[in-house]
């Protein structure tokens, strides 16, 4: 889409003016007068007729008079000799109560066809340093999600960071949306959803779903969509962080920060790295990969009185978990949730791989001995089931020893019990969503491990909430079978 014609801006002494001397897609070179070179990461503005200014961000100084900037908007229609105004500061985006319930772009402009934001809305720079180490609150309080498999095997911490790893189509976005519901329902906190490289269709669907369910009243949506320049996708996590930091520091609110998909942030950085002429590193990624990821992740932390809990989805290219981008992101995480294509194909949702997923919080000193014992026994049962799959496929369960048959019986029931209907999928499945407390999850797994459900039909444990619900389902099935027999 072509932008309106450029109107050359008039120079003034308060705002140094520069002239565009080169445009290479999302990279723009600007020349200023001697002694007026803008600082790194400061914002530049190009005035357009009848529209918001095009925002550039200074990336490097080429010589004493020239800067190289990254465009945060489309540069279509931009030309040499156009005048640019230096703002003298980093991009500042709107924050506070006025943005709650709204969808914003990387520059903080509403994109939901709603009213304009108030003129006096507070603003905050997208670039800031992490809180001083002595002010950080290293909390180990558990963030209960109501999702059985997460609370049992990969507990999340208030103020911690968790990542959901998975390829395309395994349920990352659906699980993310369910966690937004959990934050609004259980903690009366604020959720900030960041769509990094999201498809426009997905963003529209999420906004519609949130409006329909009322969750939008407790959420802020910030999008850098797939069709936008790499600069927008590269900086949109910082816009979301600025909003989250305001609610944490100024209003002392708990914030759930969700990023879908942080891998697209890395991809955008890789695109810009090529446009900036840098030599690529392994697998074509930018040589500054670890630094860029660290700059985002280290700002996600908690201070006394308020927590920012971050959950990020990570696309795994070709399901290769050794990919440099995946490993760079994983090093910052407290909990790693791995979504399995095999489990998704079998209909087990959420398709969380209980053997590949992990959490540093699954420790007796944090969650208690009983929780750790049950989680370990569940993992052992599921690991044994996996190791026996080939034997079962060739010879059948009947050829196993009695101990292995018992283990397989209980492991299959555990698999089904850890599945769960979600609130966000109600309109597709027709099945009401379930949120299960940690106590009910532990009690249900304990009963299955003790053999209480050995004579139940496996289907009775599939897509239920608590064990009591499964018990009722089993009783109904038995009555129906008895009636059919008569």
Curated annotation (Swiss-Prot):
Family affiliation = Belongs to the ATPase alpha/beta chains family.
- Please list the GO terms describing molecular function: ATP binding; ATP hydrolysis activity; proton-transporting ATP synthase activity, rotational mechanism
Organism of origin: Gluconobacter oxydans (strain 621H) (Gluconobacter suboxydans)
The EC code for this enzyme is: 7.1.2.2
Oligomeric state and partners?
F-type ATPases have 2 components, CF(1) - the catalytic core - and CF(0) - the membrane proton channel. CF(1) has five subunits: alpha(3), beta(3), gamma(1), delta(1), epsilon(1). CF(0) has three main subunits: a(1), b(2) and c(9-12). The alpha and beta chains form an alternating ring which encloses part of the gamma chain. CF(1) is attached to CF(0) by a central stalk formed by the gamma and epsilon chains, while a peripheral stalk is formed by the delta and b chains.
List the gene name: atpD2
Compartmental location: Cell inner membrane
Transmembrane feature ranges: none
Per the record's keyword annotation, is Translocase included, yes or no?
A: yes
- Residue sites binding ATP per the record: 166-173
Q: Which Gene3D superfamilies match?
A: 2.40.10.170, Bovine Mitochondrial F1-atpase, Atp Synthase Beta Chain, Chain D, domain 3, P-loop containing nucleotide triphosphate hydrolases
Name of the protein in its database record = ATP synthase subunit beta 2
Reactions performed catalytically: ATP + H2O + 4 H(+)(in) = ADP + phosphate + 5 H(+)(out)
Q: Which keywords does this chain's UniProt record carry?
A: ATP synthesis, ATP-binding, Cell inner membrane, Cell membrane, CF(1), Hydrogen ion transport, Ion transport, Membrane, Nucleotide-binding, Translocase, Transport
Q: What is its main location?
A: membrane
């Amino acid at each position: 889409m072509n932008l309106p014609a450029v109107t050359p801006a008039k120079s003034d002494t308060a705002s140094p003016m520069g002239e565009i001397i080169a445009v290479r897609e999302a990279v723009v070179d600007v020349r200023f007068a001697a002694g007026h070179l803008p600082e790194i990461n400061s914002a530049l503005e190009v005035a357009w007729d009848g529209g918001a200014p095009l925002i550039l961000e200074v990336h490097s100084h080429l010589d004493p008079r020239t800067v190289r900037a990254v465009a945060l908007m489309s540069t279509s229609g931009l030309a040499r000799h156009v005048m640019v105004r230096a703002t003298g500061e980093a991009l500042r985006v709107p924050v506070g109560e006025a943005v709650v319930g709204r969808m914003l772009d990387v520059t903080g402009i509403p994109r939901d066809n709603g009213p304009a934001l108030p003129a006096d809305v507070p603003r905050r720079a997208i670039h800031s340093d992490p809180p001083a180490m002595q002010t950080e609150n290293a909390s180990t309080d558990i963030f209960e999600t109501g999702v059985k498999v997460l609370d049992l095997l990969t507990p999340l911490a208030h103020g911690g960071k968790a990542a959901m790893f998975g390829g395309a189509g395994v349920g990352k976005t659906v699980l993310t949306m369910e966690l937004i519901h959990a934050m609004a329902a259980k903690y009366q906190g604020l959720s900030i959803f960041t769509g990094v490289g999201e498809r426009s269709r997905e963003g529209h669907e999420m906004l519609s779903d949130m409006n329909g369910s009322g969750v939008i009243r407790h959420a802020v949506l910030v999008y850098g969509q797939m069709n936008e320049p790499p600069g927008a996708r590269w900086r949109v996590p910082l816009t979301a962080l600025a909003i989250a930091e305001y609610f944490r520091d100024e209003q002392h609110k708990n914030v759930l920060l969700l990023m879908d998909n942080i891998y697209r942030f890395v991809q955008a950085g890789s695109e810009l790295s090529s446009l900036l002429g840098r030599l690529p590193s392994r697998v074509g990624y930018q040589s500054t990969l670890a630094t860029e990821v660290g700059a985002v992740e280290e700002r996600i932390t908690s201070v006394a009185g308020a927590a920012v809990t971050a959950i990020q989805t990570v696309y795994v290219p070709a399901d290769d978990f050794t990919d440099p981008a995946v490993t760079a992101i994983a090093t910052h995480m407290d909990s790693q949730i791995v979504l399995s294509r095999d489990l998704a194909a079998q209909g087990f949702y959420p398709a969380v791989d209980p053997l590949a997923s992990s959490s540093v919080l699954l420790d007796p000193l944090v969650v208690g001995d009983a929780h750790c014992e049950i989680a370990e026994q569940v993992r052992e049962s599921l690991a044994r089931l996996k190791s026996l799959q080939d034997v079962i496929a060739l010879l059948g369960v009947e050829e196993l020893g009695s101990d292995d048959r018992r283990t397989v019986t209980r492991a299959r029931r555990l698999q089904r019990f850890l599945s769960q209907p979600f609130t966000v999928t109600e309109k597709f499945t027709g099945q009401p969503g379930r949120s299960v407390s940690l106590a009910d999850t532990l009690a249900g797994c304990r009963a299955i491990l003790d053999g209480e459900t050995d004579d139940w039909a496996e289907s009775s444990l599939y897509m239920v909430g608590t064990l009591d619900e499964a018990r009722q389902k089993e009783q109904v099935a038995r009555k129906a079978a008895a009636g059919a027999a008569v």
